[in-house]
């Protein structure tokens, strides 16, 4: 026999908020709620509890919410008041929540809102949304396809917002911005966020720079070849990618931001086709960058097309936990150059106190390969 969900509808105001109307009800029995009007922090706290481990709330309809009284932090960590937003920490670890309909005029989603909602399925984002907080949908494996609105500008989809979650990204612009002849396929003076084969990118028209923002962590591809024309890999781009075994970087990609590749449990092979490679800081106020590739326990092979080790920043690989188990592959006649290359290290207390380390020898071995044959094999 099918059991009917216990449903409730509420019309809320500042004078009569949701948490007051729910105070005389047995909230643990309610499985579906529709809210119209006003929501505040106390309301979000109660809804989070109702959809958590001790609750039973499965479906939440906030479509007609037209005003909120809460604040989400901006990219500088400071509270920013908007007319309609989902509060910071709301619905974190709401493991009972299966479906949510967001407010029609929603402007911002806080951090780490919805993080750990392991049963939450597809969420439709309204066109009005212009900010998605850090780790907003962290570890939501059933999230599926995510639509990113054209209204979201650079920096407003914050770090790890969809880590270990989405299996595909779709934008209004869903094709590569340059054709085979190098001619632009877009119109206007900028194209911002765009998607290509389910991956999220950002493009700057004024300097023709293309950044890979986020690879969908739950996509079941085992091999991904980053499109030619991509120049920069952003922070958290390949975080918690559950199924990725091989990742190939094109000749155009020479900058990898710290924290770009982390927590990929099945990643075995990395291929870098560019003759030069460098890291990048997340915050320009930082003096140095680091931790570019971390926590990839099955990584066994790294292929570098660069013939000169001086053009490759060793720091990109420096934080590999299992470097002594990884084979470094370099072009023919280049192994000796890599083995003998020395990097200078200076004491932080005395600049004249220097030492020279043959850094590439930290790998398990350095072996040669022919890039021409490799390219013919599609790698």
Model-derived features: positions:
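Predominantly extracellular/luminal carbohydrate-interaction, adhesion, and secreted-enzyme modules
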Residues: 261-262, 289, 293-294, 312-318
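Surface-exposed repetitive/solenoidal architectures
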Residues: 8-93, 205, 234-240, 262, ...
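A general structural signal for stabilizing positions within well-ordered secondary structure
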Residues: 24, 50-51, 77, 91, ...
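Consensus positions within tandem repeat domains that build extended binding/scaffold surfaces
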Residues: 88-90, 110-113, 133-136, 158-161, ...
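Structural signature of tandem-repeat unit edges
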Residues: 5-13, 31-39, 55-84, 95-108, ...
